[in-house]
Amino acid sequence: MSNTTVPNAPQANSDSMVGYVLGPFFLITLVGVVVAVVMYVQKKKRVDRLRHHLLPMYSYDPAEELQEAEQELLSDVGDPKVVHGWQSSYQHKRMPLLDIKT
């Protein structure tokens, strides 16, 4: 009997493999979250800037809106219009399938 040992091949430590897999995953996830937050902040600033730009141009008066709606309704009553249905131009004279002339 000989007292020699067989050299073992070096095995990768499982903890280091986890680091090689999870490290890039968390790095990519972190970069994605940062990009999403930056895009959200830019969009919010753009919308706020647009709202502040357009707000002085628009003044809402509910009483004025009601008066305009009443005027539109009154003007529609005096102005008769002919309204055709969507089927009016597509209706054709239909011939019965079993039209037997005797």
From Swiss-Prot:
Glycans are attached at residue 3. The chain crosses the membrane at residues 21-41. Its main location: membrane. Keywords: Glycoprotein, Membrane, Transmembrane, Transmembrane helix. InterPro entries: SMIM29 (IPR043239). It is a single-pass membrane protein. This is Small integral membrane protein 29. It comes from Mus musculus (Mouse).
